[in-house]
């Protein structure tokens, strides 16, 4: 069997407004989370019409308890009330990343190489937005995923959402 074909997607970043909002929220909230002794695994801001959801994923060695989420929620709420970065109504959720943990950064993708992932792109590539396969790793600013016998290089900026698919073996 010959070498697997490699596909590369280059995408201009859409959703700049959401991206800058996420960057603003990350800059505001990551120090709060880390100051409490947790890792800020990632932040999601999902606008759903008049109402939005702000999710903060936290992690630490040994796992996360409900009390950990409460502590981060209290501190994050206080900062959000003072800084007021979100003008519309929203719900704040604080959670552990869980078994199907979302992946946000190149470092997270690299550390989970060898695991099965589900990736959704912002815009279609090769007629598809959804990829499910083996996470091969990272090359520069690209996430490498193998779907069947095809390898795809997906720029981190083109990824809308990515999650680990838990293995129950």
UniProtKB/Swiss-Prot annotation:
Transmembrane stretches, start-end: none
Any one Gene Ontology cellular component term annotated for this protein: cytosol
GO biological process terms on file: ribosomal small subunit assembly; translation
UniProt keyword list: Cytoplasm, Ribosome biogenesis
The keyword Cytoplasm belongs to this UniProt entry's keyword annotation: yes
Protein family membership: Belongs to the RimP family.
CDD domains: YlxS_C (cd01734)
UniProt cross-references to Pfam families, sorted A to Z: DUF150_C (PF17384), RimP_N (PF02576)
NCBIfam families: PRK00092.1-1
HAMAP family associated with the record: RimP
Localisation per UniProt entry: Cytoplasm
Function: Required for maturation of 30S ribosomal subunits.
Organism, scientific name: Pseudomonas putida (strain W619)
Cytoplasm as UniProt keyword: yes
InterPro entries: Ribosome_maturation_RimP (IPR003728), RimP_C (IPR028998), RimP_C_sf (IPR036847), RimP_N (IPR028989), RimP_N_sf (IPR035956)
Protein name, per record: Ribosome maturation factor RimP
